[in-house]
Amino acid sequence: MAPPNKLPTRKLAKNGPEISAVGFGMMGLSIAYGVAGSDEERFRVLDRAWELGCTNWDTSDFYGDCEDLIGKWFKLHPERRDDIFLASKFAIKVAVKKDGSYDFSVDSSPESCRAACELALQRMNVDSIDLYYIHRIDKVTPIEKTMEELSKLKIEGKIKYIGISECSSSALRRAYAVHPVAAVQVEYNPWDIDIENESGTDLLATARELGVTVFAYSPLGRGIMTGKYKSKDDFEPADTRRFYPRYNDENFPKNLKLVERFQEMAARKGCTSGQLALAWILAQGDDIIPIPGTKKIKYLEENVAAVNVTLTKEEEQDIRKMVNEAGIAGDRFERLGPYSDSAPL
C-alpha cells in the first residue's frame, strides 16, 4: 500500500528514480541532539514520515542504533519497504576513550566498505540499499579503490546507487571516472553556501557538470533557522551543538541576525522561518534535495509542508542578498574535514 500522501519528487542523477523532494535526515533520531526517544516514540515519527509521503530517508552506520531502528520498523511494516528510498553511509568510526570522550576516525578502505555494507543490510533487514555513501574519505585509501568495491557491491545487487559525502570536486571527478556517482551530500543552508564557491571547491558546479544530485544536509543550519534557539542554553545537555563554534556565547548573537531577517520575511509570507529556508534551498535547482532531520512529529510536518512555499523571483533575490551579507561568525565544525580530497592512486 502506497503512502496516503504524495510529495513532489525530484529525479536522482541522470537515470535514477523519482524521490520525494524533501527527505528525512535521521541522525537526530539516535544521536547528537539530546536523548533519543524510545523505539515506540521513534516508530511514530517514521510512521508519520511515511504517511506524509516523505519516503526519502537518510541514515548511516555512524548514527547510533538508527540502522537497527529502521530494521525493526521494516519488520513491523514489510509491505512499506518498496515505498522507501533508503540511503545509508559508511566509513566514520567512533571509539570511546578512557575519559568518556569520543575519538573519531575514518576508514573508507574496500574492506571497511564491504563489511559495513553487509552489516547494514542485516541491521536494516533489507536485501539492498538504494543509495550507499562514502560518509567521509580517509587520508590513505585512493578513492578509486573504494569505488571499485562499491561497483562490485552494486553488481551483486547489495546497493543500487553510489554517493559520496563531503568530497572535493577533484575527488568526485576521480570517483566518477571509475563508476557514475549518483549523489553528493554536503551541508548547504543559508548559513553555509561554500558548495557554490571556491571555498567548497566549486562542488555544486562540478556536480551539475556530471549530472550528480546534491543532498543538502543540515538545511536548517542544525535547527537554528527555525528561530527556536536563542542561545546555547536552549540546547539539551547532551546536545553536541553546545560545542560548535557558531553557537558559542560570542558568535551566536551575531548569527541570529540572519535568522531574524528570515523570520520577518516568513511572517509576511505566512510560513515559518524554517520553511522559508527550505523553500530557498529547493529553489536553488531541481538537482538539490534537502534532508532536514527531527525527532518530533510537529517539526517533521512543518518541514514537509515547505514544498508548498513558493518564492517569487524578487523574494529569492532578496534572500540571496541576505545570505551574501550575513557574515556568519565561527566555523561549522566539520571535525572530519569538509570537501575532502583523496589520497593519490
Give the ranges of each region predicted by the language model.
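A short, structured active-site edge motif that brings together acidic residues
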Residues: 82-95, 190
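N-terminal binding-site loop/beta-alpha segment at the start of enzyme catalytic domains
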Residues: 1-85, 345
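Structural preference for beta-strand elements that scaffold enzyme active sites
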Residues: 19-23, 55-56, 62, 83-87, ...
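Active-site groove signature of glycoside hydrolases
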Residues: 121-140
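Beta/alpha (TIM)-barrel catalytic core signal, keyed to glycine-rich beta->alpha loops juxtaposed to Asp/Glu
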Residues: 2, 6, 137-322, 326, ...
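Structural motif
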Residues: 48, 52, 123-124, 157, ...
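Active-site mouth loops of central-metabolism enzymes
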Residues: 28-40, 99-114
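Short, well-ordered amphipathic alpha-helical segments that serve as non-catalytic structural scaffolds
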Residues: 45, 110-121, 262
